[in-house]
């Protein structure tokens, strides 16, 4: 009797769940692909000489509870306002003051989607890369919202991510994935196939043109100061590349990043700031290498179980040649999606937090590592 009970217990508690799991694994159509060898080099090669690895010690928090996952940050110098897109669909405006406590948050325009990247057009309009809607233009003081484009070459955008504006008015933007939407972006990582594109939109001709395709989660994008090229990031590959506009040529800007890049911003003073949403954790290393692990993680994620660790996010400062200069991070802080330098402060956007984080770079500078 005891033996029968033990056998039945083992069957229902161990063997039966394993049998169900194996069956589900085999039936699921999700098939991850091997990643390029470059993405499997987990040791970072772009290490900055200066570091602040305790930036939360001096951090200030702006709009606590009023900014729901402010993913990107765009600063409008003339009005002294920050524009940011939140998960509830609002593009919000935040006043910039010496004291973080004096900042005022305004619900400006709700796109009805998920606003991510933000840039400013030549005629006062605010350009929004809305993950759900496509590329939008907000004008007339927020009274008019216009869809500029939501497809190219017959393929609709699934995750319109970031946008930058050239001096001639042409918009350059990314569609991170043509297969998975914003709420499924982790599946794009796990599948390991290049669904990303970089495109241009000409406001004069209204033409949308695909400049690059087959990218591994095309993310942040920023025009160069000399307007000859833009820099864009591929999150999965942990690299950023230059695209020379007139030559239609690509070259690596920086690779072997110490984390996964999100947005990139030029500060007008000879530097780019690259947000790294997470360091390369052990779970990321293993999943990128082993296909069966990625499928298991995918199946768990389908049922709301998160197995990938995202932590120790950062913002990396690099020069115009892609040489790393300084990095700001803090181990408990994750999901940094943008870093923007405004005056002497560095502002951090996030996919996780309900505020914008700010650090005084003069009081809390990055220093040489011992």
Swiss-Prot record:
Coiled coil: none annotated. Glycans are attached at residue 101. InterPro entries: 6-blade_b-propeller_TolB-like, Strictosidine_synth_cons-reg. GO terms for biological process: response to jasmonic acid; response to wounding. Belongs to the strictosidine synthase family. This is Protein STRICTOSIDINE SYNTHASE-LIKE 4. It is found in: Vacuole. Keywords: Glycoprotein, Phosphoprotein, Signal, Vacuole. GO terms for cellular component: cytosol; vacuole. The keyword rRNA-binding does not apply. Pfam families: SSL_N (PF20067), Str_synth (PF03088). PANTHER family: ADIPOCYTE PLASMA MEMBRANE-ASSOCIATED PROTEIN HEMOMUCIN-RELATED (PTHR10426:SF88), STRICTOSIDINE SYNTHASE-RELATED (PTHR10426). Induction: First induced but later repressed transiently by jasmonic acid (MJ). Slight induction after wounding, both in local and systemic tissues. It comes from the Eukaryota. The modification Phosphotyrosine is found at residue 303. The keyword Cytoplasm does not apply. It comes from Arabidopsis thaliana (Mouse-ear cress). The gene is SSL4. Residues 1-21 form the signal peptide.
């Amino acid at each position: 009797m005891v033996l029968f009970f033990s056998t039945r217990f083992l069957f229902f508690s161990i063997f039966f769940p394993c049998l169900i799991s194996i069956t589900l694994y085999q039936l699921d159509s999700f098939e991850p692909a091997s990643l390029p060898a470059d993405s499997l080099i987990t040791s970072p090669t772009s290490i900055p000489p200066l570091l602040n690895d305790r930036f939360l010690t001096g951090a200030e928090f702006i709009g606590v509870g009023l900014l729901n996952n402010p993913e990107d940050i765009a600063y409008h110098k003339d009005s002294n306002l920050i524009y940011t897109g939140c998960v509830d669909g609002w593009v919000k405006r935040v006043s910039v003051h010496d004291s973080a406590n004096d900042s005022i948050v305004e619900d400006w325009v709700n796109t009805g989607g998920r606003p991510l990247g933000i840039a400013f057009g030549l005629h006062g309009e605010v350009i929004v890369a809305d993950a759900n809607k496509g590329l939008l233009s907000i004008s007339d003081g927020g009274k008019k919202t216009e869809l500029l484009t939501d497809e190219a070459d017959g393929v609709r955008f699934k995750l319109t991510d970031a946008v930058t504006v050239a001096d001639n008015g042409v918009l350059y933007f990314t569609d991170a994935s043509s297969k998975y939407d914003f709420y499924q972006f982790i599946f794009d990582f796990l599948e390991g196939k290049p669904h990303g594109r970089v495109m241009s939109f000409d406001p004069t001709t209204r033409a949308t043109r695909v400049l690059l395709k087959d990218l591994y989660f095309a993310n942040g994008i920023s025009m160069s100061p000399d307007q000859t090229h833009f820099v864009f990031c591929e999150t999965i590959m942990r690299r950023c590349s230059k695209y020379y506009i007139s030559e239609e040529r690509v070259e690596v800007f920086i690779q072997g990043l110490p984390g996964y890049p999100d947005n990139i911003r030029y500060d007008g003073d000879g530097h780019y700031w690259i947000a790294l949403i997470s360091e390369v954790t052990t779970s990321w290393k293993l999943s990128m290498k082993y296909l069966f692990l990625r499928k298991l993680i995918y199946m768990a994620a389908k049922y709301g179980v998160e197995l990938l660790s995202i932590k120790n996010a950062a913002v990396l400062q690099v020069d115009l040649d892609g040489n790393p200069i300084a990095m700001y991070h803090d181990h408990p802080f994750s999901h940094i999606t943008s870093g923007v330098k405004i005056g002497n402060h560095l502002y951090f956007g996030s996919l996780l937090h309900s505020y914008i984080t700010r650090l005084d770079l003069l009081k809390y500078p990055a220093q040489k590592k011992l």
